[in-house]
């Protein structure tokens, strides 16, 4: 009897742990993408970047409650050759622009030259979703 109870409790705790681990997991069809500018666009600064998302939601950083499990907020990665560590909060610097208010567009002041842009969705604590929602990297030229 005790062995069955321990086994049952272990299974329940494992199921709850798996459910919590998946709480911030977007569905497999979810994606983030840059609407504009287009890849290889020639633009002037400030650059208007419009972002889209399918299969998941957008919410401001720090959102609490159930909504935080079904949404995140955008981060624009600028001129990065490598993605940030997916197990740590997304850095906050000139190459990692946080859209804390849940914005889906932003004006970026970029110097003339070639630049790369990519999106990474973060949760309420600025950590990437698991699995991470990352857009394709685009390249633009600022005149």
Regions found by a protein language model. Name each.
Residues 13-14, 46:
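Alpha-helical transmembrane segments and their juxtamembrane interfaces
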Residues 10-13, 27:
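Residue-level detector of alpha-helix boundary/anchor positions
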Residues 40, 46-54, 58, 64-143:
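Long, low-complexity serine/threonine/glycine- and acidic-rich segments characteristic of extracellular
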Residues 24-44:
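Short, compositionally biased P/S/T/A/G/V-rich stretches that sit at domain boundaries
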Residues 14-22:
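C-terminal segment of classical bacterial N-terminal signal peptides
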Residues 21-31, 130, 134-137:
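Serine/threonine-biased, Pro/acidic-interspersed low-complexity stretches characteristic
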Residues 1-9:
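Bacterial N-terminal signal peptides that target proteins for export
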Residues 8-11, 34, 107:
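N-terminal hydrophobic alpha-helix used for membrane targeting or insertion
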């Amino acid at each position: 009897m005790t062995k069955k109870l321990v086994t049952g409790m272990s299974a329940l705790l494992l199921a709850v742990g798996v459910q919590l681990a998946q709480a911030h997991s977007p569905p497999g069809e979810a994606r983030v993408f840059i609407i504009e500018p287009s890849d290889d666009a020639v633009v002037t600064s400030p650059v208007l970047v419009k972002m889209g998302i399918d299969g998941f939601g957008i919410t401001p950083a720090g959102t609490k409650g159930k909504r935080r499990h079904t949404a995140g907020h955008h981060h624009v990665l600028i001129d990065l050759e490598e993605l940030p560590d997916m197990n740590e909060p997304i850095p906050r610097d000139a190459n990692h622009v946080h859209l804390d208010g849940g914005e889906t567009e932003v004006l970026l002041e970029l110097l003339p030259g070639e630049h790369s842009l990519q999106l990474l969705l973060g949760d309420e604590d600025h950590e990437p979703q698991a699995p991470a929602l990352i857009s394709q990297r685009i390249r633009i030229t600022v005149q």
